[in-house]
Design a protein with these regions (language model features):
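Helix-start/capping segments and mature chain N-termini
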Residues: 1-72, 81-85, 103, 108-295
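Conserved acidic
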Residues: 75
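Short helix-capping segments at alpha-helix termini
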Residues: 91-92, 240
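Ordered, amphipathic secondary-structure segments that act as subunit-interaction surfaces
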Residues: 92-102
Length: 295
């Protein structure tokens, strides 16, 4: 397997060798998952000029996660300077993912939080014709439903459960993805014990039904607000399309006019089968939703 282009930059140190150690053995982000992160899309032109899509929105969401966890967040200008330095060094054309990572820091020494940025190449451009590229990655997936193990209101009035917070503790998400692969599917749609759909391990949920675009609400469900879903719904409203957030029964997923898992890095990816059942896949509708998302 060829090496994937990857960059690491640490607050207070700048860009470092990607193989250089950047956290200590007692960093609470490593030992307890006590930290948060956010991810954004990076698009780099054929000449090596890189830009981050909606960086400020992702920094705001990171800040909200840090506040919910009582972690001191570096000033925005420090994050911007670190990202700018990373982008100035990054030159691999195509799509990449920027991660903003923040941990509580060392357990046995008062040294403040650990903050770093990574950029990892994902492949060719996802937007048709973008910067001379063409859509090369598959834009459809298969999925299975898996229970998240709690009801749809489990996070209401319980801020210590960290609902809606993008923590570093993603082990359940990765375990669910492995289970999907064991079942012959690409991805997962989490469900509640009272029969509603939530989101994916690394994505928001969007469906088209009765002429409207619908997504799962945050709050009591505990799901993370999807910035890309929000952008799609805003663009759809501007286009005269009805949108809403509401609890969606799992049974409604199988009869939807379209079903997508949505993330900032991949955009809206159309789900073609769910639990082995073929779904409706309107390509014109899928193209419209992709356009709403900027893909």
């Amino acid at each position: 397997m060829s090496e994937v282009p990857h960059l690491v930059a640490v607050l207070g140190r700048g860009v470092v060798d990607a193989d250089e150690p950047v956290v200590t053995a007692d960093d609470l982000g490593l030992t307890r998952g006590d930290g948060c992160f956010d991810s954004a899309r990076v698009v780099t032109s054929a000449t090596g000029s890189a830009r981050v899509v909606d960086l400020d929105d992702h920094l705001q969401r990171l800040g909200a996660s840090a506040r919910a966890m009582d972690i001191t967040n570096p000033p925005l200008d420090a994050w911007h300077a670190l990202v700018d330095e990373a982008l100035a060094t990054w030159s691999t054309p195509g799509e990449a993912v920027l991660k903003l990572l923040l941990t509580r820091g060392r357990e046995w020494r008062s040294a403040g939080p650990t903050a770093l940025v990574t950029i990892t190449h994902r492949g060719p451009w996802l937007t048709p014709g973008d910067l001379g590229g063409a859509a090369a990655a598959p834009r459809t997936i298969t999925a299975v439903t898996l229970s998240r193990g709690h009801p749809s209101d489990a996070f209401a009035d319980a801020p210590w459960l960290l609902g809606g917070v993008k923590t570093l503790s993603y082990v359940v998400n990765t375990a669910a993805t492995r289970e999907a692969r064991r079942r012959g599917a690409d991805d997962v749609i989490f469900t509640t014990t009272d029969g509603y759909a939530l989101d994916g391990p690394t994505s928001g949920l969007l469906l088209a039904t009765d002429g409207a675009l619908v997504s799962t609400p945050t709050g009591g469900t505990g799901i993370l607000e999807s910035l890309t879903v929000a952008a799609i719904l805003e663009a759809a409203r501007t286009d005269g399309v009805a949108t809403r957030y509401e609890l969606v029964p799992v049974t409604d997923l199988y009869t939807a006019d379209g079903l997508w898992l949505v993330s900032s890095g991949r955009g809206p990816v159309l789900v073609t089968t769910l639990d082995g059942r073929a779904l409706r896949t309107d390509q014109q509708l899928a193209a419209t939703v992709a356009r709403y998302a900027g893909f």
